[in-house]
Amino acid sequence: MLGMIRNSLFGSVETWPWQVLSTGGKEDVSYEERACEGGKFATVEVTDKPVDEALREAMPKIMKYVGGTNDKGVGMGMTVPVSFALFPNEDGSLQKKLKVWFRIPNQFQGSPPAPSDESVKIEEREGITVYSTQFGGYAKEADYVAHATQLRTTLEGTPATYQGDVYYCAGYDPPMKPYGRRNEVWLVKA
């Protein structure tokens, strides 16, 4: 676990592969259109809890799996970003449902260790194309909602189309990183 934290703080962390297809923006909001590679992901779903509380429940389970709480007892190392899906209601508020996605490192993609915790699932996920915007700080539910709204507004009047029933939030930094934090909101291209 200490090795994962050290790597997260000092830069030797595997990044989820993607390709920037285009960039754009309006006023103070910029975005990238990215093609993100698919693969195998460790997932945890939490329902009936607000986003921040659901993350506090799900993230330790993912971290334990990555850190070696699996059938092989092997620590896999981190990949970034860790992403999670949010499900908006028609009024913009969020459903009490969250799904965390952690892309399994490349060296374990062929045969990922089986989770010891039954709430952690391994899922094959197709590649996706997203519209992504970035922001800093310690992100909370209100920040993700605000940045998703800003990104939607920025995409108005462009040819961009995206799914309205889900969006992803992504974090690149361990909780103890005090500054230079990177968070993103992704709208999935329709």
From Swiss-Prot:
Expression sites by tissue: Ubiquitously expressed. Extremely abundant in liver.
Gene3D superfamilies xref list: Regulatory factor, effector binding domain
Molecular functions (GO terms): heme binding
Keyword annotations from UniProtKB, A to Z: Cytoplasm
GO CC terms in record: cytoplasm; cytosol; mitochondrion
Key word Cytoplasm present: yes
UniProt KW Cytoplasm keyword: yes
SUPFAM superfamilies: Probable bacterial effector-binding domain (SSF55136)
A GO BP entry: heme metabolic process
Localization annotation: Cytoplasm
Disulfide bonds: none
InterPro entries listed in its UniProt record: Reg_factor_effector_dom_sf, SOUL_haem-bd
Subunit note: Monomer.
Family: Belongs to the HEBP family.
Function: May bind free porphyrinogens that may be present in the cell and thus facilitate removal of these potentially toxic compound. Binds with a high affinity to one molecule of heme or porphyrins. It binds metalloporphyrins, free porphyrins and N-methylprotoporphyrin with similar affinities.
Record remark on domains: Forms a distorted beta-barrel structure, with two helices that are packed against the outer surface of the barrel. Porphyrins are expected to bind to a hydrophobic patch on the outer surface of the beta-barrel structure.
Protein name: Heme-binding protein 1
